[in-house]
Amino acid sequence: MYGKSPTRAVLFLLGLQLTALWPTAAVEIYTPRVLEAVNGTDVRLKCTFSSFAPVGDALTVTWNFRPRDGGPEQFVFYYHVDPFKPMSGRFKDRVAWDGNPERYDVSILLWKLQFDDNGTYTCQVKNPPDVDGLIGEIQLSVVQTVRFSEIHFLALAIGSACALMVIIVIVVVLFQHFRKKRRAERAHRVVEIKSKEEEKLNQEKKASVSLEYTD
């Protein structure tokens, strides 16, 4: 009996050390930090995750909302095997599941945006035994019109440059075409003038010859 106690103690200590060395399992959440959308349109709130554990029926997803002007946190959406929409509140009939857990995507769709939808949307994923980790946050701004971002300005600049190049090419081609046409017209006029002068000279020669015969 006493001979087994040291062995158990060693195994217990070894187990504690292995537990301390084993990395803590945590779910990593990925969301766009800032999102801008136009009033009255629909928007996709993207949320993806990574987990050490395989995705199964134990996976749960919780979406909540914190208004920008303050107030209590509000329920938006819940997923566990099947999606559960809110039965009441501001998001009733305005939210839909648009995720695919097998692809680590737990995004949702928010329809008919309103200005009071401004605020922070949180995405929390638990995939036992991975239950720890930070909660994803999206700062949504509902605006009247979307402001131009750097990407929009870059696309506009590239489009304008391409349009300018096309216009320059068209102008050069037209210029060369009209230039060749004018040269051809000038050459044709020169030929006509020369032919008229030659014809006039021939007529004068004929007239002089006829005068010589009459003399």
Curated annotation (Swiss-Prot):
Cellular component aspect of the GO annotation: plasma membrane
Keyword presence, Signal: yes
Compartments reported by the entry: Membrane
Segments on the Extracellular side according to the record's topology features: 27-154
TM ranges: 155-175
GO BP, one annotated term: cell-cell adhesion
All copies of domain Ig-like V-type, residue ranges: 27-141
Keywords (A to Z) from UniProt: Cell adhesion, Disulfide bond, Glycoprotein, Immunoglobulin domain, Membrane, Signal, Transmembrane, Transmembrane helix
Alphabetical list of Gene3D superfamilies matching this protein: Immunoglobulins
Superkingdom, taxonomy of origin: Eukaryota
Annotated membrane topology: Single-pass type I membrane protein
Signal sequence interval, chain numbering: 1-26
UniProt cross-references to InterPro entries, sorted A to Z: Ig-like_dom, Ig-like_dom_sf, Ig-like_fold, Ig_sub, Ig_V-set, MPZL2_Ig-like_dom, Myelin_P0-rel
SS bonds (residue pairs): C47-C123
Functional description taken from the UniProt entry: Mediates homophilic cell-cell adhesion.
Protein name: Myelin protein zero-like protein 2
Species of the source: Bos taurus
